[in-house]
Design a protein with these regions (language model features):
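Intrinsically disordered, low-complexity polar/acidic regions
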Residues: 2-178
Length: 178
């Protein structure tokens, strides 16, 4: 069964709106094959009330992963995370292949890029969603993501340190396998 936009919002809203939560945005990017594009665009145009909504970037590809739902917003609705010329492709493919939660290196959020405040001060956690009954051969349905700023994470850690918990940060980038 497909996830309705209202169900996605109902799940995401408490995550983002908690007072002590560093999560800024949640999103779902739906996996599409070329024959599914027209139906997807028709549904998304009705949902967004934007008759001109399209995939970004345009063009023919073997598969697509456009931003479909988001909370509190989807600033670049329809952006294909599998597009060759976007910086998200490698980390999205990694999330799909690992079938585990993955985290980006420090990155600038799309929302900040649009507003002209493009600092690499955020992380995005991603989890691939699979369902053998509804999708292509490997069951891939899409990606769910949570975006949060580093300052928000640090404020959480600072808060917990007052309650007797302590953390140690270390640079472990040399341990990442590419």
């Amino acid at each position: 069964k497909e996830v309705a936009p209202q169900a996605f919002t109902a799940y995401s809203q408490p995550l983002v709106q908690r007072q002590s939560n560093p999560i800024l945005n949640t999103y779902f990017a739906q996996y599409l094959q070329p024959q599914d594009i027209d139906t997807f665009l028709q549904t998304q145009r009705a949902l967004t009330k934007n008759p001109y909504m399209t995939l970004i970037p345009q063009g023919q590809r073997a598969e697509y992963l456009p931003l479909t739902y988001g909370f509190p917003d989807v600033i670049l609705h329809g952006t294909d995370l599998l597009a060759e010329d976007l910086p998200y492709r490698a980390s999205v493919l990694q999330a799909r292949q690992s079938k585990m939660i993955t985290m980006t290196p420090p990155t600038a959020l799309a929302k900040d890029n649009v507003s002209g405040n493009a600092k690499r001060n955020a992380f995005i956690l991603r989890q691939a969603i699979f369902n053998d009954a509804l999708a292509p051969a490997d069951g891939f349905r899409g990606i769910v993501g949570l975006a949060f700023k580093i300052e928000g994470l640090l404020s959480q850690i600072d808060y917990l340190s007052y309650q007797g918990l302590a953390y140690r940060f270390a640079d472990v980038t040399h341990l990442v396998q590419e």
